[in-house]
């Protein structure tokens, strides 16, 4: 799923001083949404392009317009989407993740499962596939986040791992019924770009 969903980080009755942060959160959410769409579409191609193409840029711009963006916000979000996808296409790990050659590969894979307590849960896995070389199943969650001002890479990865380890653990439990293969879970940060594996208990 796309980043930036914590609307609860914005007060219920924000004052004027909160508005820039609210706009920033909205742009980050929309960038994440369109990056997810772009990576899904690329993963369905028989072969990955070496570069972002003009048709792709126009399609992503239209997706952002449909989300309600225009003017400077549209230009800023469009540039962020294009840069994230460029970085993924230029990254060997990104190209490996997006390759259509993996068996049992799915993007934006929708599942419905029951928790141990019987609660029904819907989930969408950004990318999953079997790695033929290792025989392992990968579950990968895309993130467009980057370290904050003054935040080290180690601090950033620790924070993101803590935030999403429960979500990835749920994905792993749901996917375990598909076969006996070992399952590895990771976050892929498109803006860095970096594949960061999570060690889940």
Predicted regions and their residues:
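Acidic, low-complexity intrinsically disordered tails
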Residues: 1-20, 194-201
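Non-catalytic protein-protein interaction segments used by genome-maintenance enzymes to assemble
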Residues: 5-11, 28-35, 114-169, 173-178
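A non-catalytic, helix-rich entry segment at domain boundaries
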Residues: 11-117
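Short coil/turn segments at beta-strand junctions that form active-site/ligand-binding loops
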Residues: 103, 134-136, 181-183
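Substrate-binding beta-hairpin/strand module that engages nucleic acids
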Residues: 179-201
């Amino acid at each position: 799923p796309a980043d930036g969903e914590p609307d609860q980080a914005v007060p219920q009755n924000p004052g004027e001083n909160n508005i820039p942060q609210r706009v920033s959160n909205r742009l980050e959410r929309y960038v994440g949404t369109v990056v997810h769409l772009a990576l899904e579409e690329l993963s369905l191609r028989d072969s990955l392009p070496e570069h972002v193409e003009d048709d792709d840029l126009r399609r992503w711009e239209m997706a952002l317009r449909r989300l309600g963006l225009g003017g400077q916000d549209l230009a800023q979000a469009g540039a962020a989407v294009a840069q994230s996808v460029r970085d993924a296409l230029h990254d060997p790990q990104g190209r490996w993740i997006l390759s259509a050659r993996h068996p049992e590969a799915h993007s934006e894979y929708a599942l419905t499962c029951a928790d141990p307590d019987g609660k029904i849960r819907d989930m969408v896995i950004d990318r999953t596939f079997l790695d033929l070389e290792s025989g392992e199943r990968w579950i990968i969650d895309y993130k467009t986040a980057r370290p904050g001002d003054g935040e080290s890479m180690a601090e950033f990865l620790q924070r993101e791992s803590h935030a999403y380890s429960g979500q990835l653990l749920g994905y792993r439990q749901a996917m375990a019924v598909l076969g006996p293969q070992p399952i590895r879970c990771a976050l892929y940060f498109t803006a860095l770009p970096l594949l960061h594996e999570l060690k889940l208990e």
